[in-house]
Amino acid sequence: MITGKDMYDVLAAMVPLYVAMILAYGSVRWWGIFTPDQCSGINRFVAVFAVPLLSFHFISSNDPYAMNYHFLAADSLQKVVILAALFLWQAFSRRGSLEWMITLFSLSTLPNTLVMGIPLLRAMYGDFSGNLMVQIVVLQSIIWYTLMLFLFEFRGAKLLISEQFPETAGSITSFRVDSDVISLNGREPLQTDAEIGDDGKLHVVVRRSSAASSMISSFNKSHGGGLNSSMITPRASNLTGVEIYSVQSSREPTPRASSFNQTDFYAMFNASKAPSPRHGYTNSYGGAGAGPGGDVYSLQSSKGVTPRTSNFDEEVMKTAKKAGRGGRSMSGELYNNNSVPSYPPPNPMFTGSTSGASGVKKKESGGGGSGGGVGVGGQNKEMNMFVWSSSASPVSEANAKNAMTRGSSTDVSTDPKVSIPPHDNLATKAMQNLIENMSPGRKGHVEMDQDGNNGGKSPYMGKKGSDVEDGGPGPRKQQMPPASVMTRLILIMVWRKLIRNPNTYSSLFGLAWSLVSFKWNIKMPTIMSGSISILSDAGLGMAMFSLGLFMALQPKIIACGKSVAGFAMAVRFLTGPAVIAATSIAIGIRGDLLHIAIVQAALPQGIVPFVFAKEYNVHPDILSTAVIFGMLVALPVTVLYYVLLGL
C-alpha cells in the first residue's frame, strides 16, 4: 500500500528536475536572460560534456555481473515485437511508410530513462530499480540508438539512390563514400560520381560538393537586388527530409501567394532573341555583355539566325534524352565558366557527375520525377545539379494534370525556322514546362515529336518511374542495389556517426570499466573519479535546464496539431506500457519487477530520438511535441501508474 511518505519521496525526487526546467524556460521567455545563441552554447555543453559524463558515471558504477536478464529480455522483447509489427504494417499496408515506422517505434519504445527514469524509479521502488534503469540505459545507448541510426541512414540512402539513380540502381555494385561525408541526412550538398565498369555495373563515389554551395553564393550576390530572396529560400514540402529550393509559383492560381518576380524573369530570358544555328532555342544571359560561355537554352523562339555557333555540348543532350525516360526531366540550368548560373537557381542539396572507367563515360541524371536539372558549360560541364522539386505536393500535382490537359489543346507553332532536332525534344520540353509553370496565364509553346504528335507528357511534371498521362501505367517499383551493397553503405555511415558521438564513448568506456572494476575489485583513482563527478553531478540538472531552454525556443508547445499530439501521447503512455506488460508476463515477470517495467515504459519521450528526428527531418514536430508536452504530463501519468499498480 502506498503511503503519504512514499508520495512525498516521489515528489521530492521529481520536483527539483521540474524546477530546473521552469527556470530555464523563464530565463528565455519571461526574463530574457539568454539569447538563442547563448542557449545553443549551453545545449552544446550539455550534449558534449554533461550528459555523456552523467551516462559514464551511472554505467561505470553498475555491476554488469548482477544484471537482471529477465528484465532486460522483457524490455528487448517489447521493442522487437513493436518493431516487427511496424515493419509488417509498413510492408503490406497502403498507408505504411518508413518515416512513420521510425517515428512510432521511437514514441512507443524509447523513453527518457537516463534523466527521468533513474531518480523517479529509485524514489518509487528503491535503489535496485535505479540499477535496472542503468541497465536499460546501456542497452539503449549501445543497441537501440544504433538501430535508430541504421534506420535513418537507410532512409537517407534510399532517397539519394531513388533520386539520382531511379532506373539504374539495380546495376550499382559498390559505393565509396569520401571521409568528409558524415551522413546521408540530406543537409549537406553531395555529389555522386558513377563509373561504368567493363561488366556494365555502376561503381558510385559519394563526396561532398563545394561547387554547389559556391554557385548558390555567387548567384545570391549577383542577384541580391534583382530577384526576390524567397525564390531561393527553403519552403516546407511533403517530401519529408528534403529542403527544397524552388520558386513559390504555379501555373494555376493557388491559395498561397506567389513570390515570383515575372519582370526579372522575362528580362533575363529576353535579353537576346538570336538563336544558335544548331539549336534554335537559345538566349545569351545578360545580353551582349555576357561574353563567351553565356548561352542559356530557353523556349524563346528566335526571329532569325545569327552566324555565331553555340558552345552547347550535344553529348549532354543525348544523355539528357536517355535520362529523361520514365518521367524524369532536366530543368536546363547551365553553368558558365564560374559565372552566374541561369535561372532557376540550382539546389545545393545533391549534385551528380560521372567519370569514365576504361574509356567509357556515362552520365546519370537524377531528379527522379519531381524535377531535375543538368548543368554544363565551360569547366563545369561535367556536373549535374539535381533539383528536388516540390511537384509531389497536392498543388503541383494538380498543376501537372492541368499542364497535360492544356498541352493537348494548345496551338502548336510549326514554323520551320524554330524546329528542333529530335535529340533536343526532352530538354526543350522540360524548359517549356518550367517556364509555363512559373508564369501563370502564359500560353505555352508545345513541342512536337518526330511524327508531329504531342507526346502528352510533361517531363518536368512527370512522376517518378511512371507515365503521368491519364490512363497510363501505374508506377513501377523502385529498383534498389543489392542488399549487401546497401548494408555496407549504411554501416559505413552509421559507424561515422557513432565515432563522432560522445555518448558512444561514454557508454562503451563505462561498460568496459565496470567489467574490469567489478571483476577484479579495482577502484577508480580519486583524481579521475573527482574530475568526472564534478561534471556528472551537474549533468542531471543541466539536462533538464537544456530541455527547458528547448521548450522556450519553440514557437508552440504543441507543434503538430492537437489530434496528432493526442495520438502521439496515446502511443507514448498507453501502447508502450501495454506491450511491455504483455512481454513481461510472457517471460514470467511478476510483482514489483513487473510494476517497474510498466512505469519505466510510461516515462516521457526520450530526447535522443528527437535529436535524430530533427537531424534527418523525419516528423520533428511530432517528436518535439512528445518531448515537451510529455514532460508536462509525465509526472501525473507516472504517479497514476504508480498508484494503480500499488493497489
From Swiss-Prot:
Kindly list the biological process annotations in GO that this record carries: auxin polar transport; auxin-activated signaling pathway; positive gravitropism; response to auxin; response to ethylene; response to glucose; response to hypoxia
Q: What is the effect of changing S310A?
A: Reduced phosphorylation and lost ability to recruit NPY1/MAB4 and NPY5/MEL1 to the plasma membrane
Query: From start to end residue, where is composition biased (Gly residues)?
Result: 366-378
The segments labelled Disordered in the record are 339-380, 397-420, 440-481
Side Cytoplasmic, residues: 29-38, 90-100, 153-507, 553-568, 614-626
Entry keyword set: Auxin signaling pathway, Cell membrane, Membrane, Phosphoprotein, Transmembrane, Transmembrane helix, Transport
According to the UniProt topology, which residue ranges lie Extracellular?
Answer: 1-7, 60-68, 122-131, 529-531, 590-592
Instruction: State the source organism's domain of life.
Output: Eukaryota
According to the record, what induces this protein's expression?
Answer: Down-regulated by endoplasmic reticulum stress treatment.
Q: Which residues carry this modification: Phosphothreonine?
A: T354
Deletion consequences:
Loss-of-function mutations impair the root gravitropic response, lead to an increased sensitivity to ethylene and auxin transport inhibitors, and give rise to an auxin accumulation in root tips. Exclusive NPY5/MEL1 cytosolic subcellular localization and in apolar aggregates close to the plasma membrane in root epidermis and lateral root cap cells.
NCBIfam families named among the record's database cross-references: 2a69 (TIGR00946)
**How does this protein assemble?**
Homodimer. Interacts with FYPP1 and FYPP3. Component of a complex made of PINs (e.g. PIN1 and PIN2), MAB4/MELs (e.g. NPY1/MAB4 and NPY5/MEL1) and AGC kinases (e.g. D6PK and PID) at the plasma membrane. Binds directly to NPY1/MAB4, NPY5/MEL1 and PID.
| Family membership | Belongs to the auxin efflux carrier (TC 2.A.69.1) family.
Q: What does this protein do?
A: Acts as a component of the auxin efflux carrier. Seems to be involved in the root-specific auxin transport, and mediates the root gravitropism. Its particular localization suggests a role in the translocation of auxin towards the elongation zone. Recrutes NPY proteins (e.g. NPY1/MAB4 and NPY5/MEL1) to the plasma membrane in a polar basal localization in root epidermis; this activity is optimized by AGC kinases-mediated (e.g. D6PK and PID) phosphorylation that limits their lateral diffusion-based escape.
Report what the protein is called.
Answer: Auxin efflux carrier component 2
Native species: Arabidopsis thaliana (Mouse-ear cress)
Query: Could you tell me the gene encoding this protein?
Result: PIN2
